[in-house]
UniProtKB/Swiss-Prot annotation:
GO terms for molecular function: metal ion binding; metalloendopeptidase inhibitor activity. InterPro entries: Netrin_domain (IPR001134), TIMP (IPR001820), TIMP-like_OB-fold (IPR008993). Its main location: secreted. Zn(2+) binds at C21. Keywords: Disulfide bond, Glycoprotein, Metal-binding, Metalloenzyme inhibitor, Metalloprotease inhibitor, Protease inhibitor, Secreted, Signal, Zinc. It comes from the Eukaryota. It is found in: Secreted. Belongs to the protease inhibitor I35 (TIMP) family. Glycans are attached at N79. This is Putative metalloproteinase inhibitor tag-225. PANTHER family: METALLOPROTEASE INHIBITOR (PTHR11844), METALLOPROTEINASE INHIBITOR TAG-225-RELATED (PTHR11844:SF29). The gene is tag-225. One of its GO terms (cellular component) is extracellular matrix. It comes from Caenorhabditis elegans.
Length: 158
């Protein structure tokens, strides 16, 4: 009986590891330069089970849609004068979707899908190069963004 219990525990751990989000570690500059947009946002509303807007590459997937206020934009595509106030992310953890809370502020990065939909995932978020300040595969709540990183995102040249 103990062997069966131990086998079930090991199987559960292996399944969790297999289904977990996997990201490649990147430097602050690499994450910033690979992103289409980087912004200090305040999350107003989170809505589940959303499809991406018309013209997006990913079809039929369940997404979370966040309505945000862009407090400060550090990077945006040159063809956009402002960033849209909606951000989409996968609702499934294995697809590296972000679970962030309404009413909180974050440093977020992502890409533009289709004509003008902002899309973000856990991988590629702009984090400090000093990993003692945050964990890898993380999203930074703005109050935890080190002062050095706040200054750095204002001056990175790609």
């Amino acid at each position: 009986m103990q062997n069966l219990s131990l086998s079930l525990v090991i199987l559960s751990v292996l399944i969790a590891v297999t289904l977990a989000c996997k990201c490649r570690e990147q430097s602050t500059k690499e994450s910033f330069c690979n992103a289409h947009w980087v912004s200090h946002v305040k999350v107003k509303v989170r809505v589940g089970k959303q499809g991406l807007p018309e013209g997006s590459e990913r079809k039929g997937l369940n997404n979370l849609r966040y309505t945000v206020q862009h407090v400060e934009v550090f990077k945006k595509p040159s063809n956009m004068t402002t960033l849209p106030d909606e951000i989409f992310t996968p609702s499934e953890a294995p697809a590296c979707g972000l679970k962030i809370a309404a009413g909180h502020e974050y440093l977020l990065a992502g890409r533009v899908e289709g004509p003008n939909a902002l899309y973000t995932v856990l991988c590629g978020q702009v984090l400090p190069d000093d990993r003692s300040q945050t964990s890898f595969e993380n999203v930074l709540e703005w109050k935890n963004v080190p002062q050095t990183l706040q200054s750095q995102v204002k001056s990175i040249k790609c």
